[in-house]
Amino acid sequence: LVGSEMCIRDRIYDQALYRVYIEKGKFDYLYDKVGLYDKLRGVLCHQVSAAQLTYCWQSVDGIGGKMLNFLENHDEQRFASDQFAGDADKVLPALVVSSMMNTGPMMIYFGQELGERAEDAEGFSGKDGRTTIFDYWSVTTVRQWYDSGRCSVSKLSAKQKKLRNLYKTVLNISRLESAIVRGDFFDLMYVNGENPSFNPHRQYAFLRKYGNELLVIVVNFDDRQANVKINIPDHAFETMKIVSGKYEALELIGGDKEMKELSPEIPFACALSGYGAAVWKIELKNFSKEIQKK
């Protein structure tokens, strides 16, 4: 409850009932546990192909803005726990997809941005990769950040500080970029399934666009570096009103700038580190101005 407004959210295990709960139950948001969360976990644990992430947005098409995405909560095992990814540094591709695939909110569970591993054997809960909800307990990483009420990073390790800054960067992109907050979405996987310069089982790519701002988003769930070349079909150029040409592009996570070619004939080239991601922002109006000058 915030002021006079109440936000109602819940988790439903049957996706067929999502629309009923939203339309008739008047729920503001639903946790997409059995959709996006389960698929992302499956990809990270090498149980599911990244290509299956396409089904996640398709199954909630039209209500994607009502999905509350997450990578951790009170019931699930911590991302960095041995029972899940085993290392908080593997989070970037999943975090980017979860926070940028649709217009809905992203939830961060306490201590997630610090790489909490839930290694304690807490009372009733035991050592199960979760932070107990049954016992009075003090979570080490959160206690370090709380720092006796100072709420500072002074007691965090270098790795924790780096991870926290990464979360800050990605979440601010998803919060501030109009293409993500209210823009259109275009999945690129259907034209890259047999692409020799793209592994659809370990990489995922999509577009977001609002006005003249285009984001080319690609993630790598593999531990090896990948130099990918992504096919962008004619249909994307037509439906999103993209003009082919060379553009100056800014990579929003790392800050790199490059000239990128947008064309249905020439694949979009992108270098990705292991468990990396890239969010290339292109101002389409720049190209139009160049044409006008000529």
Residue ranges of predicted features:
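Short, small-residue-biased leader/transition segments that mark boundaries at the very start
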Residues: 1-8
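Short, surface-exposed recognition loops and adjoining beta-strand edges that mediate ligand/DNA contacts
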Residues: 9-16, 189, 193
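A generic structural motif
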Residues: 9-13, 241-253
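Glycan-processing catalytic domains of CAZymes
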Residues: 11-12, 16-65
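Short, flexible loop/turn elements at secondary-structure junctions
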Residues: 12-14, 72-75, 137, 210, ...
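Loop/helix patches that line or flank the sugar-binding groove of alpha-linked glycan CAZymes
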Residues: 38, 42, 51-54, 61-73, ...
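Solvent-exposed beta-strand/loop surfaces of large extracellular or lumenal domains
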Residues: 246-267
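C-terminal beta-strand-rich structural cap/linker in extracellular carbohydrate-active enzymes
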Residues: 260-294
